[in-house]
């Protein structure tokens, strides 16, 4: 009895037979789990079934793999997941390292970096001229050159010390630079003289080399601070080079400078290198990508070709200016280089001056109005200004002002004649042209046919008012005669011509009802439908008997 009670109380478990295919799959699954495979691969294996089934339940059928299961074997997406996880881990670890090595705001302020950047931003916004002021390096006097050469001798301890100095020391010199900028500036005459002097080809090449590499020993801080002048208010016009070689070298150097100034973000400025080649590291310098350099070269070439083609056209048009055009052709490359230098110094006023020199004939496109300065601060780059004019993104005030300036600067008739746009003619030439036109017109008019000829051809008909009135009277008489001859209705009935529809069709009297709308009294109720169905069934019962094979198709079956 105890055994029976135990048996009734708990479910008896029985083992599966060895012939059951699901046992094989279960054993393989357990073996793979014991082998210690990756968790990613374990996701793909089917879930292990229980080894013992409850008694009284049928064994489930063999599970069939779907067609999509074979795709998992071929493509193995869990391996892709594994690779993705590894990549994510690498990136996260790299980011954590960077964040750990990142300097705080307080440290940057201590070093003097952050304060300087804020002051730069303030100077940009507060500049009254429009463009951001460019810090120009003044070529030092011969005395300072000798001093620097003595200091930078390889044997001296100062030079060795500066060689070993890391990047942190030049970064800390930014604070000294700010102090130097706050110092009282020199007189306006001295500033103009200092600004007008520009570094020669050797100095420019040295400046490029100094900006690219930090190998050259930096100067002592006291001297660099002393030699940095206060920035001049206006950018200075670049002087023309003397020989072809100097032209080429300066052109290349300024091209690279311009491209770097354009490509660099406003927050990141490049190194300012003095003529001796020692870089004063103001902020971090981002290296220029080669694609940008190529773009700048292409742009410079395009401007050169445009100038050449324009001046070639001018020389064809006006024979008086051929000698001037030849000279301008030779100096076209020089002009291109000057323009690039102007971009590198970010001088808005200088751009306007050079544009006025180069495009005297293109007066309409010049912006001379001083009221436009405030609105066009954002559009100091010519290309950006042109794009904004074409796309219509300029503010409305700017558009109006530009239109007014263009209309004001429209060239006169004499100027157009001088430039061979409007043909130059004397009074005699004009008279001859008029006579030729008159001759052509008179010849055409003489070829027109006369009135008699048109009447003869029956094209033109001469009419009087009397004849027209007579024609109208005749038409009225004809119409009234026809109307009088019409028979009356009675005559037509007598002749049985006009017969009514009701004469030969039986017409039953019926109530008139509104056929237009779907009204509730027009709709059939349930009782109406039942009556119709009953009537139909009665009609069907009186008709011919339905065949036995098609009785299921009919609604009515005779009892």
UniProtKB/Swiss-Prot annotation:
Biased composition regions of type Low complexity, renumbered to the chain: 25-35
Regulation: induction: Down-regulated in HL-60 leukemia cells by RA, PMA and dimethyl sulfoxide.
Region: Disordered, residue numbers: 1-65, 82-342
Localization: Nucleus matrix
Residues with the Phosphothreonine modification: 70, 236
InterPro entries named among the record's database cross-references: RPEL_repeat
Bias (Pro residues) ranges: 229-240
Record key words, sorted: Actin-binding, Coiled coil, Nucleus, Phosphoprotein, Protein phosphatase inhibitor, Repeat
One Pfam family named in its UniProt record: RPEL
Residues covered by region (Required for PP1CA binding and inhibition of PP1 activity): 438-518
Predominant cellular place of this UniProt entry's protein: nucleus
Amino acid composition bias (Basic and acidic residues), ranges on this chain: 95-113, 293-342
One Gene Ontology CC term in the entry: nucleoplasm
Record-listed Phosphoserine modification sites: 230
Family (UniProt): Belongs to the phosphatase and actin regulator family.
Quaternary state and interactors: Binds actin and PPP1CA; thus inhibiting the protein phosphatase 1 (PP1) activity.
Name used for this protein in its record: Phosphatase and actin regulator 3
Organism of provenance: Homo sapiens
């Amino acid at each position: 009895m105890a055994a029976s009670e135990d048996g009734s109380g708990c479910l008896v478990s029985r083992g599966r037979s060895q012939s059951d295919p699901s046992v094989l799959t279960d054993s393989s699954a357990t073996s793979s789990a014991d082998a210690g495979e990756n968790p990613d691969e374990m996701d793909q294996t089917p879930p292990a079934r229980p080894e013992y089934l409850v008694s009284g339940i049928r064994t489930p059928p063999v599970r069939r793999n779907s067609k999509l299961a074979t795709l998992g074997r071929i493509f193995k997406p869990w391996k892709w997941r594994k690779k993705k996880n590894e990549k994510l881990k690498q990136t996260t670890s790299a980011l954590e390292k960077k964040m750990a090595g990142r300097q705080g705001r307080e440290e940057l302020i201590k070093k003097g970096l952050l304060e300087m950047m804020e002051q730069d931003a303030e100077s940009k916004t507060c500049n009254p001229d429009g463009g951001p002021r460019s810090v120009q390096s003044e070529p030092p006097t011969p005395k300072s050159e000798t001093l620097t050469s003595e200091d930078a001798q390889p044997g001296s301890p100062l030079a060795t010390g500066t060689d070993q100095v890391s990047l942190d020391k030049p970064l800390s010199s930014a604070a000294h630079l700010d102090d130097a900028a706050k110092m009282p500036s020199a007189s306006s005459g001295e500033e103009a003289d200092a600004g007008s002097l520009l570094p020669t080809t050797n100095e420019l090449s040295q400046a490029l080399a100094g900006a690219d590499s930090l190998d050259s020993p930096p100067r002592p801080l006291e001297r660099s601070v002393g030699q940095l002048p206060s920035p001049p208010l206006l950018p200075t016009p670049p002087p023309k080079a003397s020989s072809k070689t100097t032209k080429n070298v300066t052109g290349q150097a300024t091209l690279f400078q311009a491209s770097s100034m354009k490509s660099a973000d406003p927050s990141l400025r490049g190194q300012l290198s003095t003529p001796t080649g020692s870089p004063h590291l103001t902020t971090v310098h981002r290296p220029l990508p080669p694609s940008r350099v190529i773009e700048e070269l292409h742009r410079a070439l395009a401007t050169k070709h445009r100038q050449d083609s324009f001046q070639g056209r001018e020389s064809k048009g006006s024979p008086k200016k051929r000698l001037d055009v030849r000279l301008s052709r030779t100096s076209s490359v020089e002009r291109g280089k000057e323009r690039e230098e102007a971009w590198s110094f970010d001088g808005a006023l200088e751009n306007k001056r050079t544009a006025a020199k180069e495009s005297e004939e293109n007066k309409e496109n010049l912006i001379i109005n001083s009221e436009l300065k405030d609105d066009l601060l954002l559009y100091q780059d010519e290309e950006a200004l042109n794009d904004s004019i074409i796309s219509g993104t300029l503010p409305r005030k700017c558009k109006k002002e530009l239109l007014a300036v263009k209309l004001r600067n429209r060239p006169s008739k004499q100027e157009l004649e001088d430039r061979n746009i409007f043909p130059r003619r004397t009074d005699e030439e004009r008279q001859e042209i008029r006579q030729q036109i008159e001759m052509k017109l008179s010849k055409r008019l003489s070829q027109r046919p006369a009135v008699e000829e048109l009447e003869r051809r029956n094209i033109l008909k001469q009419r009087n008012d009397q004849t027209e009135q007579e024609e109208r009277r005749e038409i009225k008489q004809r119409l009234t005669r026809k109307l009088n001859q019409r028979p009356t209705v009675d005559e037509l009935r007598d002749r049985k011509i006009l017969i009514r529809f009701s004469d030969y069709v039986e017409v039953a009297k019926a109530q008139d009802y509104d056929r237009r709308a779907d009204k509730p009294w027009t709709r059939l109720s349930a009782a109406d439908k039942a009556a119709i169905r009953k009537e139909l069934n009665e009609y069907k019962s009186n008709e011919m008997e339905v065949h036995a094979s098609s009785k299921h198709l009919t609604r009515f079956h005779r009892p």
